[in-house]
Amino acid sequence: DYLNATFYNDFIVDSIIRMFSDRNSIVIYFSDHGEEVYNFRMQQGRTDIKTDDPRTMRYQLDIPFMIYASPRYAASHPHTMERIKRSVDRPFMTDNLPQVIFDLLGVHTSYFKPERSVINDEYRQQKRRLLQVGREYL
């Protein structure tokens, strides 16, 4: 059932974080979908998608996205940690995740576009996030 799957996912994510917690490392996690589970009303699942209620859209469409930094990583990369903290409330689409990874690793390539890395000071939300034809998700 859904609750057991959520508990198992939490167990796996926690295990991975513990595995890397004593190294100079980061762990990136994101979910494959959002889910409303009694967040502000007696409702569960991804229904009611045609509504314009921002709370409904937030809980059903936003996905968890997390960057965990080990204490060693945080201590040795304070500038990167500040950039991560500044990015917390920025809208982001996971198809730009490779840009974030390039940025975190300091990869210098013509494929790196800093304006597409949510943790970069040059980040610009470029893509329209569409719910349906003619309906944008803000």
Which role fits each region the language model picked out?
Residues 1-138:
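Catalytic domains that recognize anionic headgroups
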